[in-house]
């Protein structure tokens, strides 16, 4: 004799092993905005329909095996739970892809900004600060005019981390290597030298 699943124990989708959605050599599919996605549907203002207008269009399923409304409500809960699990998985995949792209972009930026060979891997904020300093240095080098705003710039960056530092010495930045400019403008939040 077969026993049906108890109502209080919902059935879940079995765990599906992670597989890439596309081949490693192919780029990921483009992300389509919601408005473009629903543009192909005949009626885009579905939210304007009232429930009383939509209800007659949806067929009512008769209860099977003479069960009461309790079983139909449990199947709705299971369906809703399965849908939410699928939505969570899709959101997790999107978040993983976003973080992967973000980390990849930071790695590319780290390869472009000048650093010392023996330096540890820069954090994201250190990478961004070094890139800002390097871009500023290169702009000053191209224009031939040194910037006189070093004090305000270091105060801004120091306060971003909650650390305050003494104003940098009056050195012309076009005489410095970009890595030296980085050391001049940004003190380590851990009170140790980056070199």
Swiss-Prot record:
Subcellular location: Nucleus
Sequence ranges of Low complexity compositional bias: 63-75
Gene: fer3
GO BP terms, alphabetized: developmental process; negative regulation of DNA-templated transcription; regulation of DNA-templated transcription; regulation of transcription by RNA polymerase II
Sorted UniProt keywords: DNA-binding, Nucleus, Repressor, Transcription, Transcription regulation
Entry protein name: Protein Fer3
One Pfam family hit: HLH
PROSITE patterns in alphabetical order: BHLH (PS50888)
Assigned GO CC terms: nucleus
Annotated source species: Drosophila melanogaster
Task of the protein: Transcription factor that binds to the E-box and functions as inhibitor of transcription. DNA binding requires dimerization with an E protein. Inhibits transcription activation by ASCL1/MASH1 by sequestering E proteins.
Domain bHLH: 86-138
Origin organism lineage: Eukaryota, Metazoa, Ecdysozoa, Arthropoda, Hexapoda
GO MF annotation, one: protein dimerization activity
Superkingdom of origin: Eukaryota
SUPFAM superfamilies (alphabetical): HLH, helix-loop-helix DNA-binding domain (SSF47459)
Chief subcellular location: nucleus
Coiled-coil ranges per UniProt: none
Region (Disordered) location: 1-24, 56-82, 145-175
């Amino acid at each position: 004799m077969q026993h049906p699943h108890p109502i209080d124990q919902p059935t879940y989708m079995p765990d599906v092993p992670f597989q890439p959605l596309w081949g490693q050599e192919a780029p990921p599919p483009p992300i389509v905005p919601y408005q473009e996605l629903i543009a192909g549907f005949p009626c885009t203002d579905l939210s304007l329909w009232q429930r009383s207008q939509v209800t007659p269009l949806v067929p009512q399923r008769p209860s099977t095996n003479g069960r009461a409304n309790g079983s139909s409500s449990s199947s709705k809960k299971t369906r809703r739970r399965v849908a939410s699990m699928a939505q969570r998985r899709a959101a997790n995949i999107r978040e993983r892809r976003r973080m992967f792209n973000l980390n990849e972009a930071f790695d590319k930026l780290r390869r472009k900004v000048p650093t010392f060979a023996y330096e540890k891997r820069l954090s994201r904020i250190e990478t961004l600060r070094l890139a800002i300093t390097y871009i500023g240095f290169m702009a000053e080098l191209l224009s031939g005019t040194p910037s006189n705003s070093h004090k305000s710039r270091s105060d801004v960056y120091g306060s971003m981390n909650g650390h305050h530092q003494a104003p940098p010495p009056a050195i012309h930045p076009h005489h410095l290597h970009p890595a030296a400019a980085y050391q001049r403008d940004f003190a380590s939040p851990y009170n140790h030298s980056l070199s």
